[in-house]
A protein has these predicted regions:
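Charged catalytic cores and adjacent phosphate/nucleic-acid-binding surfaces used
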Residues: 1-56, 67-124, 195-361
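Conserved ABC ATPase signature
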Residues: 348-365, 440, 812-836, 852-860
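Extended, charged coiled-coil "arm/hinge" scaffolds of SMC/Rad50-like chromosome-maintenance ATPases
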Residues: 487, 494, 501-823, 829, ...
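Phosphate-binding glycine-rich loops of NTP-binding sites
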Residues: 59-62, 110-111, 350-389, 830-839, ...
């Protein structure tokens, strides 16, 4: 018998294909409506019809209590248009349904055990009748038919038909057979019909409810195309998944076939068949419900629907790929590899989850880096600055001859199905801008260990700018306000100094002092305003001035007299005359006589002194008259004109007004200063609210997307929260103020400074220092106490108002499930970052991720990362290298690429169900066996 254990491999992995697992053949003993005058003609027509099928990958040839029709198709059908033919044995089991019909139960066997079915399965099935026991073999079924008809002469074909019709088995018997033969059990898939007529749902009596549940529990799958059945057995209907698993042992996938008993029905699983006025042979309005199974067309592929009943099978007319069109890489090839670490490679890629596995140095990461290289997004250096693979070979650091080279090609399929080819050589350094997001191995693990970098990256990805507050604008304004206050304070201080020269003293009330001073000037001006006073003052002034002049002349005359008295001019003249006579004897010099001049000078002095005495007497008289009028000031002061006094009054008044203006400006400036503190806080609060609002905006950013895309997005961001938080670093503020601004003799410690700003508790400890305390302290002019060093008060205000970013910040607080980043484990941080990366990518982007599980614990991978990947791959292609079995097995990777460069072998690609791939997963990945056990337990109660 030809082998049906296909040796063909499917390197692109699990893809959606049509499977029709319920097609009867001319060997059927019931409803053999296949066209043909003879049995041979029926078979010829049947084979011809099967050969015309163009888009069905797997056929299930169905026989009642045998595999006779299947064997004939295998031996004689010569079908090259299908990938696999499976034997489907249809049984009748008790109890009967409400329509008094036995329940249809199907068992699909692995072709590898077909040769053993006669001895190990059919011979083990028995049926008792009239005191005799019959096996489910052809010879015994003929005997049963003849016994039932009570005719040993009944024709063999008729007897066989009657025997098959009367043969019934039970779940108990089938369970016993499979329990005794593990190989048979492992190579069989039990499917129960759910039709009310001949299916398990036809058992309606409440007394048989447990029996009905037990039949479902025994079955792996349900034959039904009813959407309500599909939902119910997946735990998406009236019963929860947990309840379905409790009742029936596992979630059950539904499959559907054409159940063809005639040629026209083959490959046409139309649910309108049999309805009035509908003929599947001619009607164009057939409603087809094909079974689409995402798996290799192998028996192991079919078993995958048991482990992933919700994701591996669909019942619908069109391909599931049409439901979720996506951008994906269809292939990647590296040709002309010269002195490069990767040999020439050609890989088809699955459009869903592609996982790359392998040992250290096997080539799994370099394959992903080569894809990232297309966009120049590959990592150039590692954390230590060492060149990564692509750059090492690109720069020929190994000095190879000829230099390393290759041509990397890829085919990108767009959502509309159009394809575009791209290529790039090793030496080209310009990215192709292909739609993918690449996350290198060190990107996730590196950021996950740095709180600040992780928060910054997450905020940037989401579009939150925690630096949007215009700090510089506020700081410049603060400097202007403080500078103006300083100018106004200097103006006021200069005016005070001017008043001090007029008699003002520190501590006096300046307003009162100027009031008194101006009154004094006004009174003086009033006294000087009468004619008599002005004439008296003028006369005194004139006499005083004359007296001063006389006094000066008398003093000058005294000097001349002294000179004349000391002058011995005649002796000098005689000496000179002698010298002249020596030359001119006839010349004579007359003697000098100064007595007359002396007398004249003394006469002048006597007259002047007499006049001065008279002037003094007259001045005394005039002053006495003024004193009587109450005028006691110095004459010079009194002699100032009324206009001069008025000018002084105006000057003092102007200075006072300027002082008042300066004081108002100072008060206004301080109000602006205080308001600026509040504005700084308000700005921080606005930024705080901005951060929170931006995250809310991000949460709603997919509101206009499809329901499915929105649901995926919500799953991705589930548990993530970002909010703003104003951070007041009171320790930094205290540190800066204590460094030089405050007088450490008066405030020696941080505790003392806190008490000075915020106050103290009853026990003497400082109260908590808050931003409100600081704002209040500034408003109170820093407490008005002398606790600062020289320039310290000004420096403190300047620091608080212009260097506040040192101690005041707005921080974005990122949380996962309510916990801030700071308390998350490395694994939780990595998952958080990955969730954000995935949720912020565009719908067109392919995800290329290198070992995302690094630093993640297995529980976290299973509970968080695996569900995330399962959801994401529905709308995005994911290409991911990993050494974690759960990310391959329990994320149900559609394609596994085994990297084997370390042992000198090329890449091996295929599905999880591919035996060679399956072995590699178990051998290479730590926890591979356990991962498969978890997968089996996921939707099955009590599977260990």
């Amino acid at each position: 018998m030809p082998s049906q254990t296909s040796s063909k491999t499917y390197p692109a992995g699990s893809i959606w294909r049509k499977w029709d697992l319920h097609i009867h053949s001319p060997a059927s003993v019931f409803r053999n409506d296949f066209a043909g005058a003879t049995q041979e003609e029926k078979w010829r027509n049947y084979f011809t019809k099967l050969a015309t099928l163009t888009d069905i990958s797997v056929l299930g040839i169905t026989d009642y209590f045998s595999v006779e029709g299947y064997l004939k198709v295998i031996r004689e059908g010569n079908l090259t248009n299908v990938n696999l033919i499976l034997p489907n044995v249809e049984l009748r089991i008790l109890p009967v349904t409400g329509s008094n019909t036995a329940i249809n139960l199907h068992i699909i066997f692995n072709p590898s055990v077909v040769e053993d079915l006669e001895n190990k399965f059919f011979s083990s099935l028995t049926c008792s009748y009239a005191g005799d026991s019959y096996k489910c073999t052809r010879s015994d079924l003929i005997k049963l038919g003849r016994k039932y008809r009570n005719s040993e002469l009944l024709a063999e074909a008729a007897a066989y038909r009657d025997g098959v019709e009367q043969f019934k088995t039970t779940i108990t018997e089938l369970r016993d057979i499979f329990s005794k033969n593990k190989t048979l059990a492992e190579n069989s898939i039990v499917i129960v019909s759910n039709r009310s007529g001949d299916g398990n749902s036809g058992i309606q009596h409440s007394s048989l409810a447990a029996t009905r549940e037990e039949i479902y529990r025994f079955a792996h799958c349900i034959f039904s195309s009813n959407p309500s059945d599909v939902s119910f057995f997946l735990g998406l209907g009236t019963d929860s998944k947990k309840e379905v698993m409790r009742k029936y042992g596992s979630l059950k996938p539904c499959v559907h076939g054409c159940d063809a008993h005639d040629l026209d029905s083959i490959g046409k699983p139309c649910i309108k068949r049999g309805k009035e006025n509908h003929n599947c042979a001619t009607a164009a309005d057939c409603e087809m419900r094909f079974s689409w199974i995402k798996a290799d067309p192998t028996f192991e592929g079919l078993k995958q629907i048991i482990y992933e009943p919700e994701e591996r099978v669909r019942i619908q007319e069109h391909s599931p790929y049409d439901d979720k069109r996506k951008v994906f890489f269809e292939s990647v090839s590296l040709t002309g590899s010269t002195n490069f670490i990767l040999p020439s490679t050609d890989l088809f890629l699955n459009r869903e989850l592609v996982t790359v596995i392998g040992g250290r140095g096997s080539g799994k990461s370099v394959l992903l880096e080569s894809l990232a290289f297309l966009n120049e997004e590959h990592l150039k250096v590692d954390r230590n600055g060492k060149k990564k693979v692509i750059e090492f070979y690109r720069d020929n650091d190994s000095h190879s001859e000829p230099p390393p080279s290759f041509l990397l090609k890829t085919t990108l399929v767009d959502k509309d199905g159009s394809k575009q080819a791209f290529q790039k050589t090793l030496n080209e350094r310009e990215g192709l801008e292909l739609p993918f997001l690449y996350l290198g191995q060190e990107q996730l693990s590196g950021m996950a260990t740095n709180d600040e970098e992780l928060t910054k990256t997450i905020c940037e990805l989401i579009g939150i700018d925690a630096a949007e507050l215009n700090q510089q604008e506020l700081i410049v304004e603060a400097r202007e306000v403080l500078a103006q206050i300083k100018v106004d304070e200097k103006t006021a201080a200069d005016i005070v100094e001017a008043f001090k020269k007029l008699g003002y003293r520190d501590g006096e009330d300046l307003e009162k002092w100027t009031e008194q001073y101006l009154k004094k000037l006004s009174a003086q001006q009033a006294r000087l305003s009468s004619k008599e006073t002005r004439e008296a003052l003028t006369e005194i002034n004139e006499k005083t001035q004359r007296g001063i002049k006389l006094k000066g002349l008398v003093a000058e005359a005294d000097l001349v007299l002294v000179t004349l008295e000391k002058l011995d001019a005649n002796e000098t003249l005689k000496t000179l005359e002698k010298k002249i006579n020596a030359l001119y004897p006839d010349i004579k010099l007359s003697p000098v006589d100064s007595k007359k001049q002396v007398q004249e000078i003394k006469a002048f002095q006597e007259k002047a002194n007499s006049e001065m005495e008279l002037l003094r007497s007259e001045i005394r008289v005039k002053k006495a008259e003024l004193i009587k009028k109450g005028i006691k000031e110095d004459v010079n002061t009194l002699l100032q004109s009324s206009e001069a006094i008025q000018r002084q009054i105006s000057s003092v008044g102007t200075d006072l007004e300027n002082y008042r203006i300066a004081q108002k400006a100072i008060a206004s400036g301080k109000a602006s200063r205080n308001a600026l503190m509040q504005r700084i806080r308000n700005s921080l609060n606005r930024l705080n609210d901005h951060i929170s609002a931006k995250f809310v905006e991000f949460q709603g950013s997919r509101d206009d997307s499809s329901a499915e895309e929105k649901e995926l997005f919500e799953k991705m961001i589930a548990g993530i929260g970002i909010e703003g938080q104003v951070v007041f670093d009171d320790r930094e503020l205290c540190k800066q103020l204590l460094s030089w601004r405050v007088d450490n003799r008066k405030i020696p410690s941080e505790s003392d400074l806190r008490k000075h700003i915020a106050g103290q508790q009853p026990d003497g400890t400082p109260k908590g220092l808050t931003l409100d305390n600081v704002i209040g302290w500034v408003k109170a002019d820093l407490g008005g106490s002398k606790v600062f060093n020289r320039g310290g008060e000004e420096g403190t205000l300047d620091y608080i108002l212009t260097e506040w970013p040192d101690f005041l910040k707005v921080k974005a607080v990122v949380r996962l499930n309510g916990k801030p980043i700071e308390v998350l484990s490395i694994g939780q941080r990595g998952t958080l970052l990955l969730k954000v990366y995935l949720s912020t990518s565009t719908v067109r982007q392919v995800f290329i991720i290198d070992q995302p599980e690094d630093n993640l614990d297995n529980n976290f991978i299973m509970n968080d990362l695996v569900p995330l990947v399962l959801k994401t791959k529905k709308s995005r292609q994911i290409i991911m290298s990993t050494h974690n079995a759960n990310l391959v097995v329990n994320a149900d990777a559609e394609q596994v690429i085994v990297a084997q460069l370390d042992v000198g072998k090329p890449y091996l690609a295929g599905s999880i169900e591919n035996p060679e791939i399956n072995r590699s997963i178990r051998d290479i990945l730590e926890g591979g066996e356990e991962a498969f056990r978890k997968r089996q337990r996921k939707y099955h109660e009590g599977v260990g």
